[in-house]
UniProtKB/Swiss-Prot annotation:
The lineage of its organism: Archaea, Methanobacteriati, Methanobacteriota, Archaeoglobi, Archaeoglobales. The keyword Metal-binding does not apply. It comes from Archaeoglobus fulgidus (strain ATCC 49558 / DSM 4304 / JCM 9628 / NBRC 100126 / VC-16). Pathway: Purine metabolism; IMP biosynthesis via de novo pathway; 5-amino-1-(5-phospho-D-ribosyl)imidazole-4-carboxylate from 5-amino-1-(5-phospho-D-ribosyl)imidazole (carboxylase route): step 1/1. One of its GO terms (biological process) is 'de novo' IMP biosynthetic process. HAMAP family: PurE_classII. This is Phosphoribosylaminoimidazole carboxylase. Catalyzes the reversible conversion of 5-aminoimidazole ribonucleotide (AIR) and CO(2) to 4-carboxy-5-aminoimidazole ribonucleotide (CAIR).
Length: 180
């Protein structure tokens, strides 16, 4: 009888793992903005993610003003296959705060600002020990970074990443030919 239960538990585990790793199931990027002023930049990320076949959810919460809201959002998605993308200008506490409170990948993608000569980027670079959000500038590159993470598990996403890279190479060759 104990062998039967053990076999049954193994089958349940196998079925659960197969469901979990089914192509594309549950994979999404959760874009957390520090404020509504980050919405246009976040929409660019979401648009590029759609090109890779990746769903995006956009949320607004501030590590400075509403840290409890940030924690609620993290908890809401903690059991899913997600990559968090944090978008916060000025003083970017959001990226480190999210990373310190999740085991999921966090990509910090602060929008560029001419104010302060772009120096606000430094708040995204230096993090305390044990806090490691990945810094990726530009909306398209942030989406590509998310896609590469999901490509580890999803062949369809991997193929789209490879095609994207090939298209970028073709653009260079074409630009060179046009100059000749």
């Amino acid at each position: 009888m104990s062998q039967f239960l053990s076999l049954r538990n193994c089958l349940r585990l196998t079925i659960r793992l197969l469901r979990q790793f089914r192509r594309g199931e549950g994979m999404k990027a959760v874009i957390i903005m520090g404020s509504k002023s980050d919405l246009d930049y976040s929409k660019k990320i979401a648009s590029k993610l759609a090109d890779f076949g990746i769903d995006a959810v956009m949320r607004i919460a501030s590590a400075h003003k509403t840290p409890e809201k940030v924690l609620e959002i993290i908890k809401e998605y903690e059991k899913e296959d997600v990559v968090f993308v944090t978008v916060a200008g000025r003083s970017n506490a959001l990226s480190g705060f999210v990373d310190a409170n999740t085991s999921k990948p966090v990509i910090a993608s602060p929008p560029y600002s001419d104010k302060f000569g772009g120096a606000d980027i430094f708040s995204s670079i230096r993090m305390p020990s044990g806090v490691a959000p990945m810094l990726v500038l530009e909306a398209e590159n942030a989406a590509l970074a998310v896609a590469k993470i999901f490509a580890l598990k999803d062949e369809g996403v991997r193929e789209k990443v490879v095609q994207f890279q090939e298209n970028k190479r073709r653009e260079i060759y074409k630009a060179d030919e046009e100059l000749r």
